[in-house]
């Protein structure tokens, strides 16, 4: 949680550095945001007594359902700046969790991040979502093997990095004035052959929040 808050604060600072304004964050209006609430909420629902510790299949299925909902949200909003990175990160985390029945956490990463108490807890009884990384785990490069030192104190995965970078991109782009593009009502793209000798106007590049202000294509002022 501390790392997430730090990423958000850093993103806001970067937004100001690039000429953004905080009030423009209201332009972030994702579709189907209820999938995020449902997907995250599933992870906090207590499983029946004994299931979390003994029934690996049910535990894995619950986590897979949670991440599936979050990935669906990312795909439905993939045109938003940075959302494709968030979706990639979620897919990476889901893959390693499903393959290993939970997210493996490196003991060394926990030590380097100052989480000896978490290490002792996982060694003693484990957790619903995490377990200590072992030689039997697969795709360990996607596990929680990256240590973020104190004062953050957290072990993260490659997927987490993708999510945080995508979130930063989204916040900075929104603060700089990004807004969802909308086609005028009743307008349709022209089809068919162009008249001979006619020149086609260059199509605008997709705006991911980093085009110069007022520009529709790179290298143009209007």
Where on the chain are the PLM-derived regions?
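Interfacial segments of alpha-helical transmembrane regions
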Residues: 69-99, 104
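Lipid-exposed faces of alpha-helical membrane segments in multi-pass integral membrane proteins
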Residues: 10, 38-45, 65-68, 85-95, ...
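A cytosolic-side transmembrane-helix exit/cap motif
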Residues: 52-56, 81-86, 103-113
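Long, low-complexity, intrinsically disordered cytosolic termini of multi-pass membrane proteins
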Residues: 186-222
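Transmembrane alpha-helical insertion/packing segments
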Residues: 1-66
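Structural signal for the C-terminal ends of transmembrane alpha-helices
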Residues: 12-22, 73-81, 171-178
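Membrane-interface loop-to-helix entry segments
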Residues: 58-65, 155-165
């Amino acid at each position: 949680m501390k790392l997430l808050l730090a990423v958000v604060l850093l993103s806001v600072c970067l937004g100001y550095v690039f000429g953004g304004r905080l009030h423009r964050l209201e332009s972030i209006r994702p579709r189907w945001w209820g999938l995020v609430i449902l997907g995250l909420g599933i992870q906090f629902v207590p499983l029946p007594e004994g299931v979390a510790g003994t029934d690996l299949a049910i535990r894995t299925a619950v986590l897979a359902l949670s991440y599936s909902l979050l990935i669906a949200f990312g795909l439905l909003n993939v045109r938003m700046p940075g959302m494709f990175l968030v979706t990639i990160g979620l897919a990476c985390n889901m893959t390693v969790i499903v393959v290993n029945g939970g997210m493996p956490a490196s003991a060394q990463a926990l030590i380097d991040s100052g989480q000896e108490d978490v290490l002792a807890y996982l060694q003693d009884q484990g957790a619903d979502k995490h377990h200590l990384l072992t030689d039997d785990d697969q795709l360990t490069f996607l596990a929680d093997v990256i240590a973020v030192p104190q004062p953050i104190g957290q072990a993260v995965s490659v997927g987490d990095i993708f999510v945080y970078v995508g979130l930063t991109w989204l916040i900075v782009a929104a603060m700089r004035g990004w807004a969802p593009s909308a086609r005028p009502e009743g307008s349709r793209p022209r089809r068919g052959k162009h008249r001979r000798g006619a020149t086609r106007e260059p199509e605008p590049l997709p705006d991911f929040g980093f085009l110069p202000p007022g520009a529709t294509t790179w290298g143009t002022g209007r």
